[in-house]
Every structure is written in structure tokens, then in C-alpha cells.
């Protein structure tokens, strides 16, 4: 007697390319491409059927047993009585782990010498906010607290990458502090840093305009100090959105900073590009900059919601499309954009990407006045900030951090039937809170990007078979 079988809950269909459609498993991340002639068979499998029945009904389709065997191997076809939620539980056990500290953001200055109107830090500041600079006393306590917590990481302190970000506003407005902190780290935590080797990084994202010879030498002398410069493309588009406070464009000064870094021997410099209407149709021009300056990586940042300016779905559709076009072009030159790459890696390696942001249980942010929180976007209004910096603060026992760590599509019933469940990571929790008042709501702005990327990945794979 033939077994009753059906399509499992996690199977998602992508229709129509060159006479084929795709059946994709949103948790195993397996994909099977089938000719359209099997479409009716799949429809019957959604209802539940038997192999005997299918063989009789589609007697002209000689490969039917083979196709069912392949669908079963990938978990796409299961016995009718299968409990599909068991697989979700298994995946959760592997991928939803307790919080584990990896990243510390020190907001060393929350003001800036530029006036970019899309800045998510400045646009989330309360009215009449007075900007601040971090003191060495605050930074030192934060560093001591960070190192005490690193060794407590239940996920294995040695294996994970650990990064201290010097962040702003414009962090180089407080370079004096950065220098003091780095020297303190190199003196006080010399052994730990040497033991961590490549796993320990310091990092800065800067607008580049304040880079002097002294700063460049300081950065270039350290192999574990990463630097990214914000450039939105060629001069005209960059200057439209990234002017100095006096209105003058900042491109020339940013490029000057980049060149000083190069002259002083800094080899690995990254480019960080924010995508808005000024450059959305010109992303390939970033590759011209890459050919000239040889960036270590190019990261594209879609706008995030701010208290003043929510991002529209129309914008996200366009960004998603342009990012895919850019990714396709850039990979021909061996350049892999990070945000797209995280999903691509998950898809190719068939490994669930449960979180797309370190704020979800792996990151701590210290504001200039020494308040601790999970996400730098909340720095101004101190949203999701919960303690004053103290060397005894226990990251791994904090309830806000524990809740954020749980926020993954694997724990969000709204996501269970989404094709992108396994590769998405859930987008931005802070944006979800801003839009809907809860980190547990779906970041629907980001959904557009995840789903569009998944569909592209499926058909990109097909085109390479
Ligand atoms: S929660 Fe959102 S704004 Fe905060 S760090 Fe994550 S992606 Fe960025
Ligand atoms: S956040 Fe959106 S795209 Fe991601 S899994 Fe949930 S519903 Fe799908």
C-alpha cells in the first residue's frame, strides 16, 4: 500500500522561468526546479495524495517516482501525518541561542560636522538635544565592562569575532579620546588582544573629512583597526546629501581623507554608501571609485526609519532591485556587498540566517554620557537603554538583551509562512518598534528586501545549472 504524502508547510513555490518553476524549503533552504508539466502534480501534493495515485494519474511522466524521491530527500514532501512544527523546533534549538556579547559601540561624539538630512542618529534626537562627547573616564569603565563580559559569553568567547566600534555622529570629532582608548586597550588588555588575534577588531565609520596625517598614521599602524569612509557615489550625488553644516559639499574633503590614509599605508579601507533618491540609480558608479581606490569592501545601507521620516515600501522595492543589480555587476569584479552576501551565503550554504543585526543579543551600545543600550539608533531618546555604565554590568543576565535575542523570524509566527523565513534574519527591531510600537512586529520595510533577494537567489542558481 502506498503511503499518504503531502507537500510540507515550509515548501514555497516560485513560478515561471523558461518552462520551469521552483519548490523551495524555507527552513532546509533546499530548492528543486521542476518543469511546468509537474505543476499539477504539485497542486495535488498540496491536498495530500499517494505515489501510486500520482503514478497512475500521470502515467506519461516517467520520472515521477524520481521527482517525489528528490522532493522527499529535501524535506519538501512528507508523510501526511508529519508534524511540520517539529522541524521549526529543531532549527530553533540550533540557531536561537542565549545572548553572547561580541560588539561594543562607543558613541564617542553624537554631533557631526556634516548635515546629512538622512542621518538616523541626528533624526532621532529629541528637540533641544545638546550634543555630547564621551569622556575617557566613561570609555575606560565601558572597556573594562566589555572585557569582563566577553569571557562570560556562553557561546564561546574564543570562537567569535569581537569588535569595538568608535561611532558617532562623527567619531573623529573626538579623536583624542579614540587615541586614549586604543592606547589603554593596548596597554591594559595586551595579552587578551594578542590571544584573540584576528578575532579582535577595532573599527570606525567616518565621513572622512577630518582625516589628518596624524589620524591616518595612527590607523595605518594598526592591522586590527578597520576604517570605513562614507561615500555616496561620485561628487555630484555625494554632495547633494552630504554637505558640511555651511552647505558646501564634502566629497573633496572625504576623498582627501581617503588619499591621506592611502599615502600613510592603510591598505584595507572600506566604503559605506547610504542609498537615497540622490544616488539610487547610480550605484554602479561605486565600482568606478573601487577601481581607483581598491576598497576592502563596499557596504550599501538602505535608509532606516527615523522618528521624523519613515521609509516607504516604494523606496524599498526600488532599493532592493538596485541592490540586486549592483550585486550582480560587482561580483564580476570580485566585490561582494555585505548585506546581500549574508543572505547569499545562507542560501548557498543552506544554513539559516537567524539574525541580521548584532543588536539582537550580541551588541552593547554606550552613549557619550555613559548609558548602556542595545541599539545606537535609540541613543538620543535613550530608548532601549537600561543602565549606567559600570564594570560589573552583566550583559548575559540583562532582560532587555535577552528579549532582543529572542527576536528572530524563527520565533515570530507572522514569519512562519514567509518564503524568506530561513534567510531573512528579521531586519531592524528598532524600526519595528518605531513603526508599530513593538520589536515583535515585522519590519515590513525590510521584508521587501529579503523576499526580493530570495527570489533573485533562486533564479540566479537556476541560471547557473
Ligand atoms: S536594531 Fe535596527 S537600527 Fe538598531 S542596530 Fe539593528 S538594524 Fe541598526
Ligand atoms: S521579517 Fe518579513 S521577510 Fe523576514 S521572515 Fe518575517 S515576514 Fe519574511
List each language-model region with its residue ranges.
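Long, charge-rich, low-complexity alpha-helical segments
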Residues: 32-105, 140
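Canonical Radical SAM [4Fe-4S] cluster-binding loop centered on the CxxxCxxC motif
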Residues: 98-99, 103-137
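Acidic, low-complexity/disordered tracts enriched in E/D and polar residues
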Residues: 1-45
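Radical SAM/AdoMet-radical enzyme domain recognition
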Residues: 139, 143-167, 174-302
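Local cysteine-cluster metal-coordination motifs and their immediate loop/turn environment
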Residues: 111-122, 374-377, 412-430
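Flexible mid-to-C-terminal extensions adjoining Fe-S/redox cofactors in radical SAM and related proteins
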Residues: 5-6, 382-465
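Radical SAM enzyme [4Fe-4S]-AdoMet core and its adjacent flexible, acidic
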Residues: 236, 240-255, 259, 263-360, ...
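Hydrophobic "anchor" residues
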Residues: 31, 372-373
Amino acid at each position: 500500500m502506498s503511503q499518504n504524502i503531502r507537500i510540507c508547510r515550509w515548501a514555497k513555490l516560485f513560478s515561471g522561468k523558461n518552462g520551469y518553476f521552483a519548490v523551495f524549503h524555507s527552513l532546509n533552504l533546499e530548492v528543486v526546479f521542476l518543469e511546468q508539466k509537474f505543476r499539477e502534480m504539485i497542486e495535488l501534493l498540496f491536498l495530500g495524495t499517494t505515489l501510486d495515485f500520482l503514478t497512475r494519474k500521470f502515467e506519461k511522466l516517467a520520472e515521477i517516482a524520481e521527482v517525489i524521491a528528490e522532493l522527499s530527500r529535501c524535506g519538501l514532501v512528507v508523510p501526511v501525518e508529519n508534524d511540520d512544527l517539529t522541524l521549526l523546533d529543531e532549527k530553533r534549538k540550533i540557531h536561537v541561542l542565549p545572548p553572547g556579547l561580541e560588539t561594543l559601540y562607543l558613541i564617542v561624539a553624537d554631533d557631526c560636522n556634516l548635515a546629512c538630512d538622512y542621518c538616523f542618529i541626528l533624526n532621532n534626537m529629541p528637540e533641544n538635544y545638546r550634543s555630547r562627547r564621551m569622556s575617557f573616564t566613561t570609555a575606560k569603565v565601558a572597556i573594562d565592562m566589555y572585557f569582563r563580559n566577553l569571557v562570560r559569553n556562553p557561546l564561546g568567547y574564543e570562537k567569535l569575532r569581537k569588535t569595538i566600534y568608535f561611532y558617532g555622529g562623527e567619531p573623529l570629532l573626538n579623536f583624542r579620546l579614540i587615541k586614549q582608548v586604543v592606547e589603554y586597550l593596548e596597554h591594559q588588555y595586551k595579552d587578551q588582544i594578542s590571544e584573540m588575534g584576528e578575532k579582535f577588531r577595532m573599527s570606525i565609520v567616518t565621513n572622512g573629512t577630518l582625516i589628518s596625517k596624524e589620524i591616518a598614521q595612527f590607523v595605518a599602524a594598526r592591522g586590527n583597526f578597520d576604517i570605513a569612509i562614507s561615500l555616496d557615489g561620485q561628487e555630484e550625488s555625494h554632495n547633494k546629501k552630504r554637505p558640511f553644516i555651511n552647505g558646501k559639499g564634502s566629497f573633496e574633503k572625504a576623498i582627501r581623507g581617503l588619499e591621506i590614509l592611502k599615502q600613510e599605508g592603510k591598505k584595507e579601507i572600506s566604503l559605506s554608501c547610504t542609498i537615497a533618491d540622490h544616488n539610487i540609480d547610480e550605484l554602479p558608479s561605486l565600482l568606478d571609485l573601487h577601481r581607483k581606490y581598491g576598497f576592502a569592501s563596499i557596504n550599501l545601507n538602505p535608509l532606516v526609519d527615523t522618528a521624523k521620516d519613515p521609509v516607504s515600501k516604494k523606496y524599498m522595492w526600488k532599493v532592493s532591485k538596485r541592490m540586486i543589480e549592483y550585486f550582480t555587476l560587482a561580483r564580476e569584479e570580485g566585490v561582494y556587498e555585505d548585506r546581500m552576501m549574508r543572505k547569499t551565503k545562507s542560501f548557498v550554504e543552506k544554513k539559516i540566517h537567524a539574525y541580521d543585526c548584532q543588536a539582537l543579543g550580541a551588541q552593547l551600545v554606550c552613549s557619550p554620557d555613559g548609558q548602556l543600550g542595545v541599539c545606537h539608533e535609540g541613543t538620543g531618546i535613550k530608548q532601549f537603554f537600561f543602565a549606567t555604565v559600570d564594570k560589573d554590568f552583566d550583559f548575559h543576565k540583562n532582560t532587555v538583551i535577552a528579549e532582543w535575542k529572542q527576536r528572530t523570524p524563527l520565533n515570530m509566527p507572522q514569519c512562519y509562512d514567509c518564503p524568506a523565513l530561513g534567510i531573512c534574519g528579521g531586519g531592524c527591531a528598532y524600526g519595528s518598534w518605531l513603526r508599530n510600537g513593538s520589536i515583535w512586529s515585522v519590519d515590513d520595510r525590510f521584508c521587501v528586501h529579503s523576499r526580493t533577494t530570495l527570489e533573485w537567489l533562486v533564479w540566479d542558481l537556476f541560471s547557473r545549472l
